[in-house]
Amino acid sequence: ISESFLSVAGRLLDMQGTERTPASDVSVDLQLRRLTVWTENGLIRQSQLTYQPHLQPIRVESENCIFVADPKSSFIEQHVSSVDGALRLITWFGRRNFYEKFGRFWSVVTGSPHIAPLQLSFEHWKAYWRSEHEQDAAWGGVPWRGPLPLDVPPHAHRPTDFSVMDPSLDDVASDIANRAGCPASELPFVPPLDGYSTGIPGGGTGR
């Protein structure tokens, strides 16, 4: 998926276990480029079921994206029997991404009363993946053009609702525009018109 705005009521990927063990060379691959993504409940969830315990590994490559999620959600959420097994199910390669609003980046719940849920903050997320898997990431600080419509149903969201400031007026907005392939120095001058916004959708080139 590339150069788009996505608004999802649940998650981008919600996976349940299967009865049969998947082949060793089978995985789910997500490639995300220059997106602005709103997911009400986080990006990914994996759930083992009593009679469907087998989950496919997930590999994500994400570059120059802005991920926005409900503050109560977890970016990645897993309901599994083993924390170690859960960590092996996710492979992440991130480059120059922005993360907004949510604070739990990875949550693993085993259901065992003797094992506390694993919850990783942004700093722990970066420490786990290190620079080989998560480069130049930023949490918070996107200069939005206006308040985000967090209480509006996702189906009513518009790309302009998630626009950043005019890149000629803000350094971070300029950086986002550069990552989206629209360097501020190369943007044509457009005189302001009544009812027209000069903001561009963060992380994407759509209008």
Where are each of the predicted segments found?
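Extracellular beta-rich repeat passengers
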Residues: 1-207
